Amino acid sequence: MDKYAVFGNPIKHSKSPAIHKQFAISLGEQIDYRAILAPIDNFEKTVSNFFAQGGKGANVTMPFKEQAFAMADELTPLAKIVGAVNTLKKQADGTLLGDNTDGIGFVSDLLANNVSITGKRILIIGAGGAARGVVLPLLDHQPQEVVIVNRTAEKAQNLAKLFAQHGNVSGYGFNNLPENDYALIINSTSSSMNDELPALDQKHITNCEVAYDMFYSLQNTIFMNWVAQYNSKTKLLDGSGMLVGQAAQAYYVWRNKMPAILPVVNALKQGALT
């Protein structure tokens, strides 16, 4: 049976094994997919041992995506630009291919929820790895502009410069963020994980059509509830669909078969994935 795994720290609450189990069942396949705790100071050796023992592919989650990028022998064009890898595949010649499926999973979830991207003004809160992974896939759909806001303005500006040749993208600190009508606001920070709000002024959300929190939750996150408090018409989405979407794209990278996403998202939201 082909072996796969997800590596992270912490990892015990990962839904990836249950998600990939459902993918395999739906496609009539059998795989062995496990969650593996990688020591903070020993990620590369842990992953190398897994592949040396016959592993076919791996997912990589926090905080190891940059290390996975560094250890890949070959990178997809998107992974190369993003500078982070969440999917590793052992190729026929034994080398490791690094890919990043986060952005594709994110955009596929937006489209599945009938969220319009083209011609829209988009605000991304945060300038870390999660934001970095979604900017280019968003720009591929030709929004009016993508604005990145971060506590450290320089980090947002540097991220914007990285993608400037691909579309209209800019970066700001919270204190000088332009008061534009943002149709789609994305919280890419981990604030909801800690039950905290990003430092965004409420004036920026009054005309928001869609608020998306990348944090996966069975209930509305603190960010989603905050937006709803000031704008009851806003469509609220959490990271469930992105989680399943990026996993489906990883499955496709490994096995050249694309699983159906929506049934697994529904099972995840109902707490039925074990």
Swiss-Prot record:
Enzyme Commission (EC) number: 1.1.1.25
Binding residues annotated for NADP(+), in chain numbering: G126, A127, G128, G129, A130, N150, R151, T152, A153, E154, K155, M214, G239
Pathway: Metabolic intermediate biosynthesis; chorismate biosynthesis; chorismate from D-erythrose 4-phosphate and phosphoenolpyruvate: step 4/7
Membrane-crossing residue ranges in chain numbering: none
Gene Ontology terms: cellular component: cytosol
Protein name: Shikimate dehydrogenase (NADP(+))
Gene3D superfamilies: Leucine Dehydrogenase, chain A, domain 1 (3.40.50.10860), NAD(P)-binding Rossmann-like Domain (3.40.50.720)
Subunit structure of this chain's protein: Homodimer.
Organism ancestry: Bacteria, Pseudomonadati, Pseudomonadota, Gammaproteobacteria, Alteromonadales
Known function: Involved in the biosynthesis of the chorismate, which leads to the biosynthesis of aromatic amino acids. Catalyzes the reversible NADPH linked reduction of 3-dehydroshikimate (DHSA) to yield shikimate (SA).
An individual GO BP term: chorismate biosynthetic process
Annotated shikimate binding sites: S14, K15, S16, T61, N86, D102, Y216
Signal peptide positions on this chain: none
Keyword entries, A-Z: Amino-acid biosynthesis, Aromatic amino acid biosynthesis, NADP, Oxidoreductase
Family: Belongs to the shikimate dehydrogenase family.
Entry GO MF terms: NADP binding; shikimate 3-dehydrogenase (NADP+) activity
Gene: aroE
Catalytic site positions: K65
EC main group: oxidoreductase
Catalytic reaction(s) noted: shikimate + NADP(+) = 3-dehydroshikimate + NADPH + H(+)
Organism the protein comes from: Pseudoalteromonas translucida (strain TAC 125)
Pfam families in the record: Shikimate_DH, Shikimate_dh_N
